[in-house]
């Protein structure tokens, strides 16, 4: 059996140092990846805000609010840009704040609901509180557009798109210009 080569203290020191440099560079790279992920989420949040401003421009309420009250309900991934506040092209401010899923006054407090991740029971509860009130409903997840929400975002790919639920739009109490359906076919780049 051949004997293993013995490492001199200087060789051992160099190899240990090389391993440490490699480990530190890997850890530093992980931080860069985290920064890239944060930047990507921030870009998508900003793109979501722009898509929503576009949708708002096609919607009319029976009594136009001076300030649009946007309620963010449930855990969300891309609502940070919304919560900072926005201004529509016509100069109307959009005030956004988080509201509890079980708040029975959502229909009177909100002109717009931005719905995050909620279970089916919570979703039904939200839409019961909106019944009879002119509230625009937008879901952050495109998979939930068949039940309740008027518009559902698809944020997963390189572009943000949305779907429109015509049945929910017809029953909502708000008027949505038909051109928004053309907007639904266009894509917004984050």
From Swiss-Prot:
Per the record, its GO cellular-component terms are: periplasmic space
Q: Which InterPro entries match?
A: YfiR/HmsC-like (IPR025293)
Highest taxon in the source lineage: Bacteria
Which annotated residues bind GMP?
Answer: 60, 175, 177
Just give the chief location class.
periplasm
The record lists its disulfide bonds as 71-110, 145-152
Keyword Disulfide bond among UniProt keywords: yes
- Posttranslational modification, per the record? Cys-71 and Cys-110 form a disulfide bond in the oxidized form but maintain their free form in the non-oxidized YfiR structure. The Cys-145-Cys-152 disulfide bond is well formed in both structures. The Cys145-Cys152 disulfide bond, but not Cys-71-Cys-110, plays an important role in maintaining the correct folding of the protein.
Q: How's its activity regulated? A: TpbB/YfiN repression is released through an YfiB-dependent sequestration of YfiR to the outer membrane. Binds vitamin B6 (VB6) or L-Trp at the periphery of the dimer, and both VB6 and L-Trp are able to reduce biofilm formation induced by YfiB L43P mutant. However, VB6 or L-Trp alone may have little effects in interrupting the YfiB-YfiR interaction. GMP enhances the binding affinity between YfiB and YfiR.
Phenotype upon gene inactivation: Deletion of the gene results in the generation of a small colony variant (SCV) morphology in PAO1. Mutant exhibits slow growth, reduced motility, a highly aggregative and wrinkled colony morphology, strong attachment to surfaces and strong, exopolysaccharide-dependent resistance to macrophage phagocytosis. The deletion mutant, although suffering from a tremendous growth disadvantage, shows characteristic persistence behavior under antibiotic selection and during prolonged infection in vivo.
Tell me which UniProt keywords the record has, alphabetically.
Disulfide bond, Periplasm
Matching Pfam families, A to Z?
Answer: DUF4154
* Compartment annotation: Periplasm
The answer, when asked if Aminoacyl-tRNA synthetase is one of the entry's keywords, is no
- Tell me the function of this protein: Negatively regulates the activity of the diguanylate cyclase TpbB/YfiN, leading to decreased c-di-GMP production. Inhibits TpbB/YfiN allosterically, through a hydrophobic interaction between the C-terminus of YfiR and a conserved region of the periplasmic PAS domain of TpbB/YfiN. Under reducing conditions, may also act as an YfiB-independent sensing device that is able to activate TpbB/YfiN in response to the redox status of the periplasm. Part of the YfiB-TpbB-YfiR (or yfiBNR) system, encoding a tripartite signaling module that modulates intracellular c-di-GMP levels. The system is a key regulator of the small colony variant (SCV) phenotype, and plays an important role in biofilm formation and in vivo persistence. The c-di-GMP produced by TpbB/YfiN stimulates the production of the Pel and Psl exopolysaccharides, which promotes surface attachment, generates an SCV phenotype and confers resistance against phagocytosis.
Complex and partners: Homodimer. Interacts with TpbB/YfiN. Interacts with YfiB. The YfiB-YfiR complex is a 2:2 heterotetramer.
The protein's name:
Negative regulator YfiR
């Amino acid at each position: 059996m051949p004997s293993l080569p013995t490492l001199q203290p200087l060789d051992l020191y160099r190899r240990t140092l090389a391993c440490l440099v490699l480990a530190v560079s890997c850890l530093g790279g992980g931080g860069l990846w985290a920064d890239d992920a944060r930047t990507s989420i921030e870009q998508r949040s900003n793109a979501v805000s722009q898509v929503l401003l576009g949708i708002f421009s096609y919607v009319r309420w029976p009594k136009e609010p001076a300030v649009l009250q946007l309620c963010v309900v449930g855990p969300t991934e891309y609502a940070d840009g919304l919560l900072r506040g926005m201004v529509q092209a016509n100069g109307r401010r959009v005030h956004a704040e988080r509201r509890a899923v079980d708040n029975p006054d959502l229909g009177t407090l909100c002109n717009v609901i931005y719905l995050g991740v909620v279970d089916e029971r919570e979703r039904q509860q939200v839409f019961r509180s909106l019944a009879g009130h002119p509230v625009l409903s937008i879901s952050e997840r495109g998979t939930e557009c068949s039940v309740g929400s008027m518009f559902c975002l698809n944020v997963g790919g390189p572009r943000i798109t949305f779907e429109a639920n015509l049945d929910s739009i017809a029953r909502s109490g708000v008027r949505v210009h038909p051109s928004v359906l053309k907007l639904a076919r266009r894509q917004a780049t984050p």
